[in-house]
UniProtKB/Swiss-Prot annotation:
This is Glycogen synthase. GO terms for biological process: glycogen biosynthetic process. It is an enzyme of class 2 (transferase). InterPro entries: Glyco_trans_1 (IPR001296), GS/SS (IPR011835), Starch_synth_cat_dom (IPR013534). The keyword Glycosyltransferase applies. Synthesizes alpha-1,4-glucan chains using ADP-glucose. GO terms for molecular function: alpha-1,4-glucan glucosyltransferase (ADP-glucose donor) activity; alpha-1,4-glucan glucosyltransferase (UDP-glucose donor) activity. It comes from the Bacteria. Its EC number is 2.4.1.21. The lineage of its organism: Bacteria, Bacillati, Bacillota, Bacilli, Lactobacillales. It catalyses: [(1->4)-alpha-D-glucosyl](n) + ADP-alpha-D-glucose = [(1->4)-alpha-D-glucosyl](n+1) + ADP + H(+). ADP-alpha-D-glucose binds at residue 15.
Length: 477
């Protein structure tokens, strides 16, 4: 099968979050499964700086962005058997960052038009075209409405993956004519209109042949008013083509037996290296080196969406216990300040690292006993899977991908891969935390069994790839 991905970011070239991880990993697994895969990404200045000498020029042409004729260069490289094509236009993409400009609508309108028009020129007409989030969600609409006259594109099947429904691409309806060069018929009849705006995500949901999300629970949640971000009724209407597939993690990169960022390696049969990493981490962050105290890790953006309003409200109570917490992250200044203040009050119990450090993050995943992740909503989440890979048990709010990946501790059977609570409140966070502390202190054999189950969980991309192939084969025979 010929499969083409079009996305706004993709590791290792450009990455701001989970979308970049998916584009970096899923195509590689599909190639291993015997498929021909290509990816189209914007050619950002950070790509030029880091990978420019590995990327070759292929061709160039002009794209009509409404009344404008814009330069479009095509560049190319091959990595892990995947062919990466880059759309080059320095005016749109040499901004020093991926998102956040006033003209993001124009930037990604150009990108989508260029990606579609590039397919014939690079001689890669896919059986299946997979687009991601709002930045590329107009492509299924454009294929069926603007480019339907191109015979080579007639049989292309499309999949839209929603990584985060909060970001929908809502713009003025004038963009249809001014940038995309199409009429207003589909806006006037309500197809593309939402809250009196042009909504790119709605267009993708309605026009894509299939819609996927990054976990089965999130697929159900976005059809409710609580999580649907005002598109729940549209998603319910299209529910027959909506499904959820849990993202994977790179099992080779996140491997406690070979991880180059760790001082000591270990496996599920021998955790002595994990204990040594714990002592090393305690020393590094200025906490007393104690093997007996439970060490809790947090690696996250410090935002309300990640549940840190509830964590801060619970922190004084939690720190009354004989426990240590090491935090790594940045975000809302109020939460940054709160953690810094608590770290001054409880210097032997809390280390607040208001920054981001890849090595320290990896050490936290590997060395801690518990990993705290009480997100208010979480489409998939990767940190809990990384933590489990290293035998660090997640304590999570039972929502979205956290519900699908963390098997809650069952005290009757003594089974599970972590701890979870259903109601996001200080009471239930504290109650679940106490359950975990009791198990750690008084039932080490059960704790050890949970660690083993967590480390044996299969979150590899090769496994996730099989689910995506099932989805693709439902469209392409």
């Amino acid at each position: 099968m010929k499969i083409l991905f079009v996305a706004a970011e993709g590791a290792p070239f450009s990455k701001t979050g989970g979308l970049g991880d998916v584009i970096g990993a899923l195509p590689k697994s599909l190639v291993k499964a015997g498929h021909e895969v290509a990816v189209i990404l914007p050619y950002y200045d950070m790509v030029e700086a880091k990978f420019g000498n590995q990327i070759e020029d292929v061709l160039h042409f002009e794209v009509s962005v409404g009344w404008r004729r814009q330069y479009c260069g095509i560049k190319k490289t091959v990595l892990n058997g995947v062919t990466f094509y880059f759309i080059d236009n320095q005016y749109y993409f040499f901004r020093g960052h991926v998102y956040g400009d006033f003209d993001d609508g124009e930037r990604f309108a150009f990108f989508q038009l260029a990606a579609i028009e590039a397919m014939e020129r690079i001689a890669f007409i896919p059986d299946l075209l997979h687009v991601h989030d709002y930045h590329t969600a107009m492509i299924p609409f454009l294929l069926k409405e603007k480019y339907r006259w191109i015979q080579a594109y007639e049989d292309i099947e499309t999949v839209l993956t929603i990584h985060n429904l909060e970001f929908q691409g809502q713009f003025s309806e004038g963009m249809l004519g001014d940038l995309f060069g199409v009429g207003f018929e589909r806006y006037a009849d309500g197809t593309l209109r939402w809250n009196n705006c042009l909504n790119w995500m709605k267009a993708g949901i309605l026009y894509a042949n299939r819609v996927s999300t990054v976990s089965p629970s999130y697929a159900h949640e976005i059809m409710t008013s609580q999580f649907g971000c005002n598109l729940d009724q549209i998603l319910k209407m299209e529910s027959g083509k909506v499904s959820g597939i849990v993202n994977g993690i790179d099992a080779d990169l996140y491997n406690p037996q070979t991880d180059a960022l760790l001082d000591y390696h270990f496996n599920q049969e021998d955790l002595s290296g994990k204990a040594k990493n714990k002592a090393k981490l305690q020393e590094r962050v200025g906490l007393p080196v104690r093997a007996d105290v439970p060490l809790v890790g947090i690696v996250s953006r410090l935002t309300r969406q990640k549940g840190f309003d509830v964590v801060v409200e619970s922190l004084h109570h939690i720190l009354q216990e004989d426990v240590q917490i090491v935090l790594l992250g940045t975000g809302d200044p109020a939460f940054e300040g709160a953690f810094s203040w608590f770290a001054q009050i409880y210097p032997d119990k809390l280390s607040a690292n208001i920054t981001f450090d890849v090595k320290l993050a990896q050490e936290i995943y590997a060395a801690c006993d518990l990993f705290l992740m009480p997100s208010r909503f979480e489409p998939c989440g990767l940190s809990q899977m990384m933590a489990m890979r290293y035998g660090t048990l997640p304590l999570v709010h039972e929502v979205g991908g956290l519900r699908d990946t963390v098997c809650a501790f069952n005290p009757i059977e003594g089974s599970g891969t972590g701890f979870s609570f259903d109601n996001l409140s200080p009471y239930w966070l504290n109650w679940t935390f106490q359950t975990a502390l009791d198990l750690y202190r008084n039932h080490p054999d059960i704790w050890r069994n949970l660690q083993k189950q967590a480390m044996e969980s299969d979150f590899s991309w090769d496994t996730a790839c099989k689910s995506y192939l099932d989805l693709y084969h439902s469209l392409v025979n």
